[in-house]
Amino acid sequence: MSGERAKRFPLALEDLKRAPRKSDGRAGERHAAIAAPKAADKPAAVPKPVALKPGVARMPPGTAAAKPATALKPTVPKPAMPKPIAANAAPAGAFALTSERVRERMVERLRANGVTDPRVLDAMAAVPRHLFVDAGLATQAYEDSALPIGHQQTISKPSVVARMIELAMAGRTLERVLEIGTGCGYQAAVLSHVARDVYSIERIKPLYERAKLNLRPLRVPNIRLHYGDGRVGLPSAAPFDAIVIAAAGLDVPQALLEQLAIGGRLVAPVGAQSGQPQVLTLIERVAHAQWRESRLDRVFFVPLKSGVI
């Protein structure tokens, strides 16, 4: 090596390779990081699998052993027991049916179908029909359809109830009304809004009891229910301004015609023979021994029977 070159490079090239120049700590760290993979060239020892007992965890050396866990039985929630539902109560899903708006829509349909007396329409709007049918039928309570109430009997369609009451009233103020066939009590409840006193007879004892239960929450003071034969009527309370019969016979019993006041009106379905259509019939008593009959609409009712059960 020349003198000038020796001054510039005091160490031989071999020495530079054997003793590399040290650098600051950060550079050393960088070299260490770069050199780290070389150290990893040697495969690490793989620990042999250790058979563990069920439920025991293998802990690293120097770690305090944890207390064995206590096995807990899974908590199974008890199913909620359904609350009993009253026979005439509307289900929760039918809550909207209890609103006045639903009854108002029913009244709008009645008005569109020809019912014009505002007292009848107000009475139909005031009585909650869903309280008089079984809970399973509550969603149909305000449809214009007859519904079963048990014992092979039905609650009449709202349009038929309104039509019969309007015919019986004929624009008059009713004092005393007789209903034959209480059923579930719905028509009697409507009549109580347009008459001073309502007398209603039911021949089927379970329906008579059911009507009392249905009417009790409404606290209707002017309805008098009777258990007996409707074909006989109620002579002790006669004469009546109006009589409404909610069952169809071959004719109207003479006993009921005799209990109608002069000027009074009786409304009943007539014609119960097999294959014979029933016709809604209006009978007016014009004198002591004279009645006038008008045959009106085709209808369908359960038969009018005698006796009690």
UniProtKB/Swiss-Prot annotation:
One of its GO terms (biological process) is protein modification process. InterPro entries: PCMT, SAM-dependent_MTases_sf. Residues 33-46 have a biased composition (Low complexity). It catalyses: [protein]-L-isoaspartate + S-adenosyl-L-methionine = [protein]-L-isoaspartate alpha-methyl ester + S-adenosyl-L-homocysteine. The keyword Chloroplast does not apply. Keywords: Cytoplasm, Methyltransferase, S-adenosyl-L-methionine, Transferase. Its EC number is 2.1.1.77. Residues 14-32 have a biased composition (Basic and acidic residues). Residues 1-46 are annotated as: Disordered. GO terms for molecular function: protein-L-isoaspartate (D-aspartate) O-methyltransferase activity. GO terms for cellular component: cytoplasm. It comes from the Bacteria. The active site is at S156. The keyword Kinase does not apply. Its main location: cytoplasm. SUPFAM superfamilies: S-adenosyl-L-methionine-dependent methyltransferases. It is found in: Cytoplasm. Belongs to the methyltransferase superfamily. L-isoaspartyl/D-aspartyl protein methyltransferase family. PANTHER family: PROTEIN-L-ISOASPARTATE O-METHYLTRANSFERASE, PROTEIN-L-ISOASPARTATE(D-ASPARTATE) O-METHYLTRANSFERASE. Catalyzes the methyl esterification of L-isoaspartyl residues in peptides and proteins that result from spontaneous decomposition of normal L-aspartyl and L-asparaginyl residues. It plays a role in the repair and/or degradation of damaged proteins. This is Protein-L-isoaspartate O-methyltransferase. It comes from Burkholderia vietnamiensis (strain G4 / LMG 22486). The gene is pcm.
